[in-house]
């Protein structure tokens, strides 16, 4: 499922939030979201279940939880204002939803940077079928 979604995003040429989130991830980690995070563990990419596999996957779990607190926002497609300078991501002004989505993405990108030292290439293309057990509460 995640693979189909990512391919669809690439084919459409998204100019919204997902592209912005990728830029934040690249800024913080020097890695492109695709392929390094799009299919990582049980929570990076579309959906998620089971227990996060490591600190990187936990960043994605927390990001999913953050989006989950914004049920009336278009978290995947809303375009928000932000800047990347002096080593920091700064979210700009916008609608309430845009500002909240930007903060979710900023916090996740910074979390991924902090988790770089424990990134495991074995989780890079992790099969959903290996994500077992109940999901944690947000």
Swiss-Prot record:
Q: Which cofactor does it need?
A: Ca(2+)
List of catalytic residues: 63, 105
Cofactor: binding comment: Binds 1 Ca(2+) ion.
Q: Where are the transmembrane segments?
A: none
Protein name (database record): Basic phospholipase A2 sistruxin B
- Localization annotation: Secreted
Disulphide-bonded residues: 42-131, 44-60, 59-111, 65-138, 66-104, 73-97, 91-102
Q: Where is Ca(2+) bound in this sequence?
A: 43, 45, 47, 64
EC numbers listed for it are 3.1.1.4
């Amino acid at each position: 499922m995640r693979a189909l979604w990512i391919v669809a995003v690439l084919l459409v040429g998204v100019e919204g939030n997902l592209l912005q989130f990728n830029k934040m991830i690249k800024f913080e980690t020097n890695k492109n979201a695709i392929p390094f995070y799009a299919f990582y563990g049980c929570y990076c990419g579309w959906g998620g279940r089971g227990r996060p596999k490591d600190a990187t996957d936990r960043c994605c779990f927390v990001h999913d939880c953050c989006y989950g607190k914004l049920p009336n926002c278009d978290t995947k497609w809303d375009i928000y204002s932000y800047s990347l300078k002096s080593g920091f991501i700064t979210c700009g002004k916008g609608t309430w939803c845009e500002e909240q989505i930007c903060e979710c993405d900023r916090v996740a990108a910074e979390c991924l940077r902090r988790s770089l030292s424990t990134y495991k290439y074995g989780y890079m293309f992790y099969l959903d079928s290996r994500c077992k057990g109940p999901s944690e509460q947000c």
